[in-house]
C-alpha cells in the first residue's frame, strides 16, 4: 500500500503526522522503519522521532562535501512492513541508482514494502503552473501525476490560513530571522487561501478518480449467480 500526505505549503504538519502514524503502527505491532524524515529542526517533529526505529542515512561525498541520502539498499535488505519516506519530490545526488526519490519509493513498493510519504502541492507536475500563478514561485523538483494516481490513499493535511500564520509567528516553521520574509512572500494570507483551495481540490479529484476506478474494477469482477 502507498499513502501520500499532501500539504498546501511548508509547515502544515506532514512530517509530524507521518511520525504520529508510525508510532500508532508500532504500538499495533507493525514492523515500521523511518527510511527518511526531514525535521527542518522543528522541535515538535524532532521529539516525535523518539522511540521510532530509524534506518541510518547513506553518506556520500559529492564535490568535496559529505551529503546524506536515504539508504535504499538498507531498506530493501531490512524489508520492513512499512517505511516512512519524507520529501517525495527530492532529487537524489548524482550517481545514485535512481534520479528521484519517488523512483526509490516505486522500487520499495515493487519489493512489497508499504510506504507512507509526503509532498507539497507545488511539487506536483500538473499544479506547478497554478502555484507559480498564485505565489510567483516556480519549483524545479516535481513529481509526475502518475505517482499520485498510483497511491492507494491521498490525504490532505489541512490548516486554516490563521492557524498556519500563527504557527509561523510562533517559530514552529522557520527560524526567527526567516519569519518576516516568509510573511511578506509565500505566507501572505491571500496566497495561503488560494493554495489551500488548490490542495483541497486536488485531493477531492484524486478521491473521485479512485472511486471511479473502483466502480469500474468492481463491475468487471461481479459474478452473477443464479
Kindly give the residue locations of the regions a language model identified.
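Short, glycine-rich nucleotide/cofactor-binding loops
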Residues: 6-15, 93-96, 220-226
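Substrate-engagement module of ASCE P-loop NTPases
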Residues: 100-120, 143
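Conserved RecA-like ASCE ATPase "motif II neighborhood" in helicase/translocase motors
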Residues: 62-87, 98-101, 135-138
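Internal gly/pro-rich beta-alpha loop/helix module
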Residues: 117-180
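Conserved ATPase-coupling elements of RecA-like P-loop NTPase cores
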Residues: 87-102, 126-129
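Conserved P-loop
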Residues: 2-77
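Long, charged amphipathic helices and adjacent flexible linkers at domain junctions
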Residues: 179-225
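Loop/turn-to-beta-strand initiation segments
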Residues: 31, 79-82, 111-117
Amino acid at each position: 500500500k502507498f499513502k501520500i500526505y499532501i500539504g498546501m505549503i511548508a509547515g502544515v504538519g506532514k512530517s509530524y503526522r507521518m511520525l504520529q502514524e508510525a508510532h500508532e503502527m508500532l504500538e499495533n505491532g507493525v514492523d515500521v522503519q523511518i527510511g527518511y524524515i526531514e525535521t527542518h529542526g522543528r522541535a515538535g517533529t524532532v521529539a516525535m522521532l523518539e522511540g521510532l526505529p530509524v534506518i541510518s542515512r547513506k553518506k556520500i561525498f559529492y564535490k568535496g562535501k559529505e551529503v546524506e541520502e536515504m539508504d535504499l539498499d538498507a531498506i530493501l535488505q531490512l524489508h520492513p512492513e512499512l517505511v516512512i519516506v519524507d520529501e517525495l519530490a527530492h532529487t537524489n545526488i548524482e550517481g545514485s541508482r535512481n534520479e528521484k526519490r519517488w523512483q526509490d519509493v516505486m522500487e520499495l513498493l515493487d519489493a512489497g514494502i508499504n510506504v507512507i510519504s509526503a509532498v507539497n502541492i507545488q511539487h506536483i507536475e500538473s499544479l506547478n503552473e497554478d502555484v507559480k500563478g498564485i505565489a510567483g514561485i516556480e519549483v524545479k523538483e516535481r513529481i509526475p501525476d502518475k505517482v499520485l494516481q498510483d497511491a492507494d490513499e491521498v490525504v490532505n493535511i489541512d490548516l486554516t490560513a490563521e492557524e498556519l500564520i500563527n504557527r509561523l509567528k510562533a517559530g514552529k516553521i522557520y527560524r526567527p530571522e526567516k519569519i518576516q520574509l516568509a510573511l511578506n512572500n509565500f505566507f501572505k494570507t491571500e496566497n495561503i487561501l488560494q493554495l489551500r483551495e488548490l490542495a483541497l481540490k486536488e485531493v477531492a479529484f484524486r478521491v473521485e478518480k479512485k472511486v471511479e476506478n473502483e466502480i469500474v474494477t468492481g463491475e468487471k469482477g461481479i459474478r452473477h449467480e443464479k
